[in-house]
Amino acid sequence: MPTTVSAPETLSETRTQTRELLLQTALSMLEQGWFPSITELANASGVSRATAYRYFPSQAALVSTVVDESLGPVLQWQPTSTSVEARVNELLDFAYPRMEQHEGALRAALQVALHQWANERARRAQDEPKYRRGNRRRLLTLAVEPMVRAGVDPAVAERLAQALSLLYGTEAMVVLKDIWGLDFRQFMNVIKWMSSALVRATLAQAGGAAGAGGGAEAGAGGAGVAEGAAQGAAEGTAEGTAAAGGGAAREQV
């Protein structure tokens, strides 16, 4: 006898298929550099506007879901090293290739965040759902955790995580790829050089506590150069980010 499928099961499957169709269409459009409105997404997917809006009531809701779907493995990252410098490199090596693969979605998320910031300044977005994420903070806090276990002041470790947050995410990709024209390999070299300088400078300031940084034995002279360069870069970039982004609440990864 043929198997009878109940109406609720059929409806549930249809909804799942429709949601997946919308997500895949949105991802394809974003990767082509097209940031679609919900109406444009509906047209491209062959569904009604009402259906598309039922799944994604705003561009912010759409982008948030697309980012979650495409970067899911990054959010589950767990370190394997006990060295802060090695942990940070692990995170960069693990996350950035996937971020590059879904760069269109991440750029769209940044665009949404900046648009919402502008609306907030103009007092026009009180009822609009905010696009806010905190994964960057969680992942970088996990990366610098060995410093705290080794006896470094938690406030110092937190400041390092804050500085590293300027090197991890869409903003760094935009600056180094768009302004400097770097390819992915060059981009990764610069990011890892900067992150190592920050880690080593922090450990030098903290007295090289318990070798938590993996590579802190670079020498007082080298650490001093790294410290000065890292401090200047962190201060300058932080100032620019604060002026352009309107706060750390808007995070993509």
Each model region followed by its residue ranges:
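Intrinsically disordered, low-complexity terminal tails and inter-domain linkers enriched
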Residues: 119-122, 207-252
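Hydrophobic/aromatic-rich alpha-helical bundle segments in the mid-to-C-terminal region
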Residues: 146-194, 202-213, 231, 235, ...
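Amphipathic alpha-helical packing segments from all-alpha helical-bundle domains
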Residues: 101, 108, 118-162, 189-200
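Basic, helix-initiating cap at the start of DNA-binding domains
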Residues: 1-44, 60-61
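Amphipathic alpha-helical segments that line or abut small-molecule/effector binding pockets
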Residues: 24, 85-111, 188-192, 196
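Residues in the recognition helix of alpha-helical DNA-binding motifs
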Residues: 55-56, 65, 190
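Short hydrophobic/aromatic patch on the recognition helix
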Residues: 46-56
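Amphipathic alpha-helical linker/stalk segments
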Residues: 28-31, 35, 44, 64-94
